[in-house]
Amino acid sequence: MTAVEGSGDNIPAASREAPPAYTSLSTFELPKGEDRHYVQQYADMYFLRLVQLKPVVEQVAAEAWENYQVERVLDVRQGELCWVVGTIYMEMPLKPKVLDDISKEHWISAPPPREKYISPDGTHETMIEDESGRLRLTGRCLKDQILVTGAIIAAIGTENSDGVFEVADIIVADLPRQPARWELEDSASAVSGKSKKDTHKPSGNKIALISGLQISGSATDLLQLNLLAETLCGELGGPEVAAKAATISRLIIAGDSLADACPIPSREELAATKRGGSKKYGYDASSYNAAPTDHLDAFLESILPTIPVTLLPGQTDPANVQIPQQPLHPALFPKARTWARSPAKQAEDAGPGTFDPVTNPWEGEVEGWRFLGSGGQPVSDVFKYVESDDRLEMMASMLRWRCNAPTAPDTLWCYPFQDDDPLLITDCPHVYFAGNQPAFGTRIIEGPAGQEVVLIALPRFKETGQVVLVDSETREVEVIEVELVEK
């Protein structure tokens, strides 16, 4: 295909707007400017999470266990059957500590990142806490459950002579209400008084999802990106692949589009840099490499506007580190931003552009289905707490806990929310995805009220060459591969 040239001002406004079957929600957008503060205490987040989810968990537990509730975890009595609601806290000796951060600040060699926080000898402890205090938990059922710090649960059991609560069973909030298909678009039409467009007919489109491009600026990266662009646009591959590509209505890139940044330099390397040449605009121009962002920008421009793009930041991308990560700045994409919503329309209800840089996590409606997903950091952090390697089961647990990032802020950096926690899941998605996982996987889970969610673990494209396609009518998932054969 031919890339579109010229500035955004020369392109008709209508052509820069995204197709009507797409709505991006601002669920995870942080306050702007002076309204964004980092002086709050993180402890308030867990209290806020408990306050918001406790009534829901209590309702589910009361239906199952009836009249055995005690209001506070410290009100349990030895030998008496009862149930309590609280926040799980995992005491693990291998979890990162504040001293590790201090070591980094003072140029002391910090311990390498751990693959798991759980210790092989099983010395970790599971506790439940509320505003009154903490209570240690034990019991066989704990081994059958995925539990991490920050999950809100109800536990039934008795306190033993050691003051430990022996758990017989555990209940969680489970999946929340699932909106009907096209709910956002139909609501917007009703509010505006506009007639509903004829967009609800079966389209047979595909929504493409990809993660982990990890562009480093090498020649191999450029060749792989060109193959990917040609495949998505139907210019490469057999008739079957071309037919699938022709139906792609949107591409969602779920984080880690750029390769990992350079490691923190040693004291000697830093001193050598200071003795080196002059700096321009505050950085050493000789060590700056713009090729990764240039290649990503060129790739996006090559598929826009044929395929609209939703771009999530990831752990290795130039965005804020803490969750929720804010959209990548349009200045990084001088070519692709032609197709983004113009700054003049930011304050208007104009909808997103064909190129839509969004937050991580992100929530939106695509082809009428509610999508919710992230660049994968919350799932990867939950993985460190448990013995299991089943990423899809972890994703299912996060949905049933109704929390996008339960381990934040304990071991996953996040913004210190005070009045509301947007990381809580209030609407059950139809498709829930996590980027940058070790391998592709998909599963369908169901809720107590008939909710049905398609879980998708997205592999790193850099390692697998895999692109995931979701059918816009059936939500069936399939994979196509873009292989670079070296001779």
Task: Cite the ranges covered by each PLM segment.
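Extended recognition/assembly regions associated with phosphoester-bond processing machinery
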Residues: 1-487
